[in-house]
From Swiss-Prot:
CDD domains: WW (cd00201)
Binding site residues for substrate: 203-207, 218, 374-376, 439
Alphabetical UniProt keywords: Methyltransferase, mRNA capping, mRNA processing, Nucleus, S-adenosyl-L-methionine, Transferase
Domain RrmJ-type SAM-dependent 2'-O-MTase: 231-450
Main location per the UniProt record: nucleus
This enzyme's EC code(s): 2.1.1.57
Protein name per its UniProtKB record: Cap-specific mRNA (nucleoside-2'-O-)-methyltransferase 1
Residues at the catalytic site: 239, 364, 404 (proton acceptor)
Region entry Disordered, spans: 1-81
SUPFAM superfamilies: DNA ligase/mRNA capping enzyme, catalytic domain, S-adenosyl-L-methionine-dependent methyltransferases, WW domain
Pfam families attached to this UniProt entry: FtsJ (PF01728), G-patch (PF01585), WW (PF00397)
Keyword Transmembrane: no
Length: 846
C-alpha cells in the first residue's frame, strides 16, 4: 500500500484541527499565548487553496512570514495606504512578525480578533456597556463659533412705550380663558419655528443623561462657571452683583433724572427693598453687603426647606432683613399665589415705609420641573404673574423691579411683559453672564414705575384669582393681552422676537457645547480663572473665600473697636446740675437734652442675639443682655434699659425697651467724630433698619427724643401724673414718648455739642444762628469742623438734672423749701434770661 507524502498529509491534519477548534466553540476574538507562539513560527504554511476562488481571496490581503505569498502588498509597511498606516513603523513591524494580515485575525487558523480593540467609551458611573440612545449621535451644531468670553456686557432696552397705560375699561375685555395647554412646540408667534424646534431637540437630548455627568460637563464648558458665589450664600448673590453693575447700580444706588444719587449714607432715609420668592436670600445678602445698615429689606417666600436662611448670611448683617409671610405675618405660609398674602405683604410694607413703598423689588422664584423642562414656562406662568403683581403692589413711584423669567414664547408670558412695558419708564430683558448659558433663565429689569398703574394692578389681581379658581380644571387663562395688541405695537413685537431668537441661539450652542464636553472629557475652558478675576474686579467684589464670622468675646471686641482711646472716659459720671453748675448753660444754643429713665450703660452687639452690656467702669465685666432683640455685629451704643408702660390701671402693660442715648459704632462704622445731631440722626436710621414690627415678642429699640435746650418747655408739656401698677395706687410723674408709651423719668441729660472756644449765638439782623470763636473773635454761619464735639467730649461734659424727691417738675408736685435742688421754674428762668429773642418757628438742627 502506497503511503501518502508529507505534503499531502499536512493539510488534512490542519483541517481536522481547525474543525476540532470550531467544534469546541472556542472564542475566536482572542488567542492563547501558545497559539500566538505557534502562529509565529517561520515554517507556518499559508492557507492557500488550489481553487481559483481561494487564490483570488488570498491576493486581497497582506501575507507576512516566510511561508506566505511574498508578492502581496504589505499594508502594514510604512507609507502604504491602509487604515493601519496611522501606527508607527515599530508597531507595524511587531505585528508583521506575529504574522498579522489585514482582514484576518492572529493565530494558526486566523481565529484571532480581526478589528482593533477600541478605546473605552465608559462615561462616568454608567453601567458597563451602557449607551444612551439619542445622546451619542452628533448634534451638528457649531458651538465653537460662540463669541469670546468677556467680563463686559451691554444693555438692550425695549423702546420707550409711547401708548397710555391701559385703563379698567380697556382691560376688562383682555383676559381670555381657554383649554389648558401643556405643549410648547407650536408657540412660534414670537420665535422662528426652526429655532424653537432645535432648542427643544437639544434639551431633549439630555433627558437620559445622568445628572452628575451633565453637571460636570456644564462646569467645564461654561467660561464663567468659576465665579460661583464667592463669599456669599449662593450664586444668586453674584447674579445680583453682576446685574447691579451692568445697570449702573440703579438698585443699590438709585439716581434721579439728572444722574444724582437719590439717597446718601449721611442722610436719614433708608434704602428700602423687597425680596420675593427668593429663599434662601442670596439677592438680599448682596444688597445688605453693599449697603450695610443704610438699607432695610422685607422678604416673602414659601415656608419650608427653601425658606430664608438668615443664619447663613456671613457677608452681610441679616438683622436688617425682616421676613414677612403674608396673612398671619411670621406665622403665614408665604405662598405668593394667595391673594390674601399679597394684600397683607403690601399693607405691611406701606406701614413701614411711610406709605411710600420700597425703592426696588427683586424676585427670583422657581421650582423643580424635573422631567418637564421643555414646558417650564407654562408650569410657572402663575408664579411669574404673581411676582409681577407683588412688584406693582409694593414698589413706590419711580422705583425699580427685577424678576427672573424663563422661556417667553407663549402669548400669556409676552402679555405680562407688555403690561410691565406699559407701567415702567424703561424695560429690558437681560441674561447676565452669571446665568448659565445653557438654561432658559433671563431677567426682566424695569426702571422707574409710573403713576396711574392701579388699574393694571387690579386687573392682574383678578387674573390671579381666576387662575386659582381654574387650578384643578382643564381650563386656563391663555391670554392677558390680546394678540392683536401685541402685534400692533411693532417696536415691542420686534424686540420680543429678537430677544427670544437671540436667547435661543445662545442656548442651543451652549447645549451643544455641553453635549460635546460630555462625549469628550478632555475638553475644558482654559480661561475660567482669568474671567473670574476680571469679573470680580469689574463688579467691585473682593476675591475672597466664604468664611463663617469668628466668635469674639465682648471685652476683646470692645478694645478692637475703640483701639487706643482712653478707657477711663467711659467711667465718667455726669456733672450734677445745681445752682452752682447752672452757669455752665450760659450758651444755651450749645446744648441738647433728653429725658432719663434709668442708669446709662454701654451696649455691644456681636451679631444676632449676642448682645452685652457694661457699666463703664474698668472693674466691671460685660454681661449678656437678658432681652429678646437683635443687633448687627460691631455695634457699640450708649443706652438705657427702660421699663415702658402702656395704659393705666389693671390693663396696664409693661415692656423693657432699649433707649439709645448716643452711638459710637454702627455695624463697624465709626461715628464718634460726627456731630451729636448727626449721630442721633444716624442712630434713628439704624434703629429703623433693625426694627422688627412683625415681631411683637421682641424688645423694641428706640432713640431718645432729643430737644434743644431752648425748647425745654416742650418736655414739660409731655409730663403728666399717672397711676402706676407698682406704686401702690399713688400718682407718679410720667413722660409720654412719640409712640404713646410712657415711663417714670428720673431726670434730664444735658449734652454739650460744641467744642470750646466755639459757641453758638443768634443774629437778630440775619434772623439765624451763627458760630462764634471767643479766642479769634471770628464768626460764621457754616458749621466749623473744629467746633464739633466728638462722643468722648459730649460724654465727659454732660450734665444731669435729677428729678428726685423735693424737685417740683409738674404743677401737682410740691417743692421742698429746704431743698437746694433746682426746680423747673429756676431752670426756665435761667434759660429765658440767657436766651435771645428768637422766632419760635426757627428749627436749625445745629
Amino acid at each position: 500500500m502506497k503511503r501518502k507524502s508529507d505534503s499531502e498529509q499536512q493539510p488534512s491534519v490542519q483541517c481536522r484541527k481547525k474543525k476540532r477548534i470550531e467544534e469546541l466553540g472556542l472564542n475566536l476574538s482572542s488567542t492563547s499565548d501558545d497559539d500566538t507562539q505557534y502562529s509565529n513560527h517561520g515554517t507556518q504554511e499559508s492557507s492557500t487553496s488550489s481553487t481559483s476562488s481561494d487564490s483570488d481571496n488570498e491576493e486581497k490581503r497582506p501575507v507576512f512570514g516566510s511561508g506566505r505569498n511574498e508578492t502581496l502588498p504589505d499594508t502594514l509597511a510604512e507609507g502604504s495606504s491602509s487604515h493601519y498606516s496611522m501606527y508607527n513603523s515599530v508597531s507595524q513591524k511587531l505585528m508583521a512578525k506575529m504574522g498579522f494580515r489585514e482582514g484576518e485575525g492572529l493565530g494558526k487558523f486566523g481565529q484571532g480578533r480581526k478589528e482593533i480593540v477600541e478605546t473605552s467609551k465608559q462615561k462616568g458611573r454608567r453601567g458597563l456597556g451602557m449607551v444612551l440612545k439619542g445622546f451619542e449621535k452628533e448634534l451638528n451644531i457649531n458651538w465653537r463659533s460662540e463669541p469670546e468670553a468677556t467680563a463686559y456686557e451691554e444693555v438692550d432696552w425695549f423702546p420707550e412705550c409711547t401708548t397710555d397705560i391701559p385703563d379698567s375699561d380697556e382691560l376688562s375685555d383682555w383676559m381670555i380663558v381657554g383649554k389648558r395647554k401643556l405643549i410648547i412646540d407650536d408657540e412660534t408667534e414670537f420665535c422662528r419655528d426652526n429655532l424653537l424646534t432645535s432648542l427643544l431637540q437639544c434639551k431633549s437630548a439630555f433627558d437620559e443623561l445622568e445628572g452628575e455627568e451633565m453637571r460636570r460637563a456644564r462646569t467645564r464648558s461654561n467660561p464663567y462657571e468659576m465665579i460661583r458665589g464667592v463669599f456669599f450664600l449662593n450664586r444668586a448673590a453674584m447674579k445680583m452683583a453682576n446685574i447691579d453693575h451692568v445697570f449702573d447700580y440703579m438698585f443699590t444706588n438709585p439716581k434721579d433724572s439728572q444722574g444724582k444719587p437719590k439717597l446718601k449714607d449721611k442722610e436719614s432715609e433708608l434704602l428700602y427693598f423687597a425680596d420675593v420668592c427668593a429663599g434662601p436670600g442670596g439677592f438680599s445678602e448682596y444688597v445688605l453687603w453693599r449697603k450695610k445698615w443704610h438699607a432695610k429689606g422685607f422678604g416673602m417666600t414659601l415656608k419650608g426647606p427653601n425658606d430664608f436662611k438668615l443664619e447663613d448670611f456671613y457677608a452681610a448683617p441679616s438683622e436688617l432683613f425682616e421676613p414677612y409671610y403674608g396673612e398671619g405675618g411670621v406665622d403665614g405660609d408665604g405662598d405668593v399665589t394667595r391673594p390674601e398674602n399679597i394684600t397683607a405683604f403690601r399693607n405691611f410694607i406701606l406701614d413701614n415705609t411711610d406709605h411710600k413703598g420700597v425703592h426696588f423689588m427683586m424676585a427670583d422664584g422657581g421650582f423643580s420641573v424635573e422631567g418637564q423642562e421643555n414646558i417650564q414656562e407654562i408650569l410657572s406662568k402663575q408664579l411669574l404673574l404673581c411676582q409681577f403683581l407683588v412688584g406693582l403692589h409694593v414698589i413706590r413711584t419711580g422705583g425699580h423691579f427685577i424678576c427672573k423669567t424663563f422661556d417667553l414664547f407663549t402669548p400669556f408670558s409676552v402679555g405680562l411683559i407688555y403690561l410691565l412695558y406699559c407701567c415702567f419708564e424703561r424695560v429690558c430683558l437681560f441674561k447676565p453672564l452669571t446665568s448659565r448659558p445653557a438654561n432658559s433663565e433671563r431677567y426682566v429689569v424695569c426702571r422707574g414705575l409710573k403713576e396711574g398703574i392701579d388699574d393694571v394692578r387690579n386687573y392682574l389681581f383678578n387674573v390671579n384669582r381666576r387662575l386659582n379658581h381654574l387650578r384643578n380644571s382643564d381650563q386656563d387663562v391663555t391670554l392677558v393681552v390680546p394678540l392683536e395688541v401685541l402685534r400692533g405695537d411693532k417696536q415691542f413685537n420686534e424686540y420680543m422676537v429678537r430677544s427670544n431668537e437671540s436667547c435661543c441661539e445662545v442656548q442651543i450652542k451652549a447645549l451643544a457645547k455641553i453635549h460635546a464636553f460630555v462625549q469628550d472629557s478632555t475638553l475644558s475652558e482654559s480661561r475660567q480663572a482669568d474671567i473670574r478675576r476680571e469679573c470680580l474686579k469689574l463688579w467691585g467684589v473682593p476675591d475672597q473665600a466664604r468664611v463663617a464670622p469668628t466668635n469674639t468675646d465682648a471685652r476683646t471686641k470692645f478694645f478692637q473697636l475703640i483701639q487706643s482711646q482712653n478707657i477711663e472716659v467711659f467711667g465718667y459720671k455726669p456733672t450734677p446740675l445745681t445752682a452752682k453748675t447752672l452757669e455752665k448753660l450760659i450758651h444755651v444754643f450749645d446744648y441738647r437734652c433728653m429725658v432719663c429713665g434709668s442708669e446709662p450703660k454701654f451696649l455691644l452687639g456681636l451679631g444676632r442675639s449676642q448682645i452685652y452690656t457694661w457699666g463703664g467702669r474698668s472693674n466691671e465685666r460685660w454681661t449678656r443682655l437678658d432681652l429678646k432683640t437683635e443687633l448687627p455685629r460691631d455695634t457699640l451704643l450708649s443706652v438705657e434699659i427702660v421699663h415702658e408702660l402702656k395704659g393705666e390701671g389693671k390693663a396696664q402693660r409693661k415692656i423693657s425697651a432699649i433707649h439709645v442715648l448716643d452711638v459710637l459704632f454702627l455695624n463697624g462704622t465709626d461715628v464718634r467724630t460726627q456731630h451729636f445731631t448727626q449721630r442721633i440722626q444716624l442712630a434713628e436710621k439704624f434703629v429703623r433698619a433693625v426694627a422688627k414690627p412683625s415681631r411683637p415678642d421682641m424688645n423694641p429699640i428706640r432713640v431718645k427724643e432729643v430737644y434743644r435746650l431752648e425748647d425745654i418747655e416742650k418736655i414739660f408739656l409731655r409730663l403728666d401724673m399717672k397711676h402706676i401698677k407698682s406704686s401702690g395706687g399713688y400718682l407718679r410723674l410720667s413722660y409720654t414718648g412719640r409712640d404713646d408709651r410712657h415711663f417714670v423719668p428720673c431726670g434730664l441729660y444735658i449734652v454739650k455739642t460744641i467744642n470750646e472756644p466755639w459757641s453758638m449765638a443768634y443774629s437778630k439782623s440775619q434772623k439765624r444762628k451763627y458760630f462764634y470763636n471767643s479766642k479769634t473773635k471770628n464768626s460764621q454761619f457754616e458749621l466749623p469742623v473744629e467746633s464739633i464735639a466728638p462722643f468722648h467730649t459730649c460724654y465727659y461734659e454732660r450734665l444731669f438734672w435729677e428729678w428726685g424727691e423735693g424737685v417740683q417738675i409738674h404743677d401737682s408736685q410740691r417743692r421742698d423749701p429746704d431743698s437746694d435742688k433746682l426746680s423747673k421754674d429756676a431752670v426756665l428762668q435761667f434759660i429765658q434770661a440767657h436766651h435771645p429773642c428768637m422766632p419760635s418757628s426757627l428749627t436749625e438742627d445745629r
